[in-house]
């Protein structure tokens, strides 16, 4: 890589920001691109992979027997919470600070990743580049990747016919997972595997499948939305738009603010390390050498669960139930009464608490900042703001919640609702489009690093009881 003296001030500032952010060597910054290969994501990966392959070999050889912690009965019975057991390169979740994408926090991503003009929200294509390479991309690299995604976005006709075979009333996630399965006939990995590709090259068709899948998902998702809620009148892609803006356009929303929201939404929902249901499912299924289409379809079925991806639709429905019962001008005292009513009925306040986080989710904070900028007078946003003040003290008083603070789901539905995307039942599909970027990025590295079939040991309650007796 050749570095020129005439680098732009922006590149200097970005480089300096990375150096000063006290990060690990995970994130790299290249100031100037000098050849066509620098704009090609696959070429960049091809250069990076050998180094990381040597790194994992060294880690296994020198530290393979190092213990990472003790496994307790609580962990086994409690959904493996707190159990370190997965390698996930693309992101790491800190209980206090929240998610870091390749070492960068969300505020750092907003500052460093190339953004759309004039709004400034990071382009999702930039985060895809970051997750795959560990490098903050230039605007030229992001533009090249955006063009590549557009070139792969055409969806085969049979996919639409497969979706149309389902009742239009089928849940959007059912239709979405079905559409992804129909896309699977394109799989380059399956074809290469059947031809006997060497395992050291598994990552290459995995990359091709992953990029194509990411490119086509917004088209499939938008088709489902228009089929269900807009009389089947689909909207074609616009080759002048970036990934997030094009998705908003195909859904039928062309305002600059909605395009900005979609860029933000897709970016912050991409990845949340590897232990959540959808990410873990995708990784698990892919460990059997199932291709990215099969693996991501499985991940979507996990995402569709009420305890995972459906939470964002439940938040908006709950907020609307507050308005329905208490009126639009609900006071904080009324809110307190309604929250206690919810809790005393054995339910939870949706959008609050998190399995890992012990502070306010930074994904909530950046959505709140977006709302303060674009829709400060929206009644539902004002209600969400009041909930932010009222709910945590009540949950703290209750004493049973480790994290009383809002998570990402507490805010997203209100933003979407403001711009007219009011169909809460559909919201998890948006989540799925975004999450593909993180899951598929890691799948490429799973194959590049030669990660094995996942096969943890299971035990019975009798085994646990006997083991505990011996240990006492």
UniProtKB/Swiss-Prot annotation:
Gene Ontology biological process terms, A to Z: carbohydrate metabolic process; citrate metabolic process; tricarboxylic acid cycle
EC number: 2.3.3.16
InterPro entries in the cross-refs: Citrate_synth-like_lrg_a-sub, Citrate_synth-like_sm_a-sub, Citrate_synthase, Citrate_synthase_AS, Citrate_synthase_euk, Citrate_synthase_sf
Pathway: Carbohydrate metabolism; tricarboxylic acid cycle; isocitrate from oxaloacetate: step 1/2
Keywords from the named record: Mitochondrion, Transferase, Transit peptide, Tricarboxylic acid cycle
GO CC aspect terms: mitochondrial matrix
SUPFAM superfamilies found in the cross-reference section: Citrate synthase
The keyword Transit peptide is assigned to this record: yes
Subunit structure, as described in the record: Homodimer.
Other facts noted in the record for this chain: Citrate synthase is found in nearly all cells capable of oxidative metabolism.
Record's protein name: Citrate synthase, mitochondrial
Species name: Daucus carota (Wild carrot)
Gene field: CS
């Amino acid at each position: 890589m050749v570095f020129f003296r005439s680098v732009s001030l922006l590149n200097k500032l970005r480089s300096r920001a990375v150096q000063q952010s006290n990060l690990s060597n995970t994130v790299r910054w290249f100031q100037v691109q000098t050849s066509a290969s620098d704009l090609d994501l696959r070429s960049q990966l091809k250069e990076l992979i050998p180094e990381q392959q040597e790194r994992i070999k060294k880690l296994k050889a020198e530290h393979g027997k190092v213990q990472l912690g003790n496994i307790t009965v609580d962990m086994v019975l409690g959904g493996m919470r707190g159990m370190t057991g997965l390698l996930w390169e693309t992101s790491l979740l800190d209980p206090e600070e929240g998610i870091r994408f390749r070492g960068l926090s969300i505020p750092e991503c907003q500052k460093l990743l190339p953004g759309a003009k004039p709004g400034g929200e990071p382009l999702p294509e930039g985060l895809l580049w970051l997750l795959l390479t560990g490098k903050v991309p230039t605007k030229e690299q992001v533009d090249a990747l955006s063009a590549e995604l557009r070139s792969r976005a055409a969806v085969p006709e049979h996919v639409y016919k497969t979706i149309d075979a389902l009742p239009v009333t089928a849940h959007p996630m059912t239709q979405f997972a079905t559409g992804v399965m129909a896309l699977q006939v394109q799989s380059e990995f399956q074809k290469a595997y059947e031809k006997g590709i060497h395992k050291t090259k598994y990552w290459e068709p995995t990359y091709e499948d992953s990029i194509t899948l990411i490119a086509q998902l917004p088209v499939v998702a938008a088709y489902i939305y228009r089929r269900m809620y807009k009389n089947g009148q689909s909207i074609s892609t616009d080759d002048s738009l970036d990934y997030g803006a094009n998705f908003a356009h195909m859904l039928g929303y062309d305002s600059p603010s909605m395009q900005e929201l979609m860029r933000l939404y897709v970016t912050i929902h991409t990845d949340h390390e590897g232990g959540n249901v959808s990410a873990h499912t995708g990784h698990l299924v892919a460990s059997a050498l199932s291709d990215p289409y099969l693996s991501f379809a499985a991940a979507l079925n996990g995402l569709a669960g009420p305890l995972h991806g459906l939470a964002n639709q439940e938040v908006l429905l709950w907020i609307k139930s507050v308005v329905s019962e208490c009126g639009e001008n609900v006071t904080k005292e009324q809110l307190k009464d309604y929250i206690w009513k919810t809790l005393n009925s054995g339910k939870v306040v949706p959008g609050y608490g998190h399995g890992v986080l012990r502070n306010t989710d930074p994904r909530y904070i950046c959505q709140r900042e977006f709302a303060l900028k674009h829709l400060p007078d929206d009644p539902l946003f004002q209600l969400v703001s009041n909930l932010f003040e009222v709910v945590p003290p009540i949950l703290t008083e209750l004493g049973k919640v480790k994290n009383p603070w809002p998570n990402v789901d507490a805010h997203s539905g209100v933003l979407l609702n403001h711009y007219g995307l009011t169909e809460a039942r559909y919201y998890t599909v948006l989540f799925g489009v975004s999450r593909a970027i993180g899951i598929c990025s890691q799948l490429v590295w799973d194959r590049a690093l030669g990660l094995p079939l996942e096969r943890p040991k299971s035990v019975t309650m009798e085994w646990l009881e006997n083991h505990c007796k011996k240990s006492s």
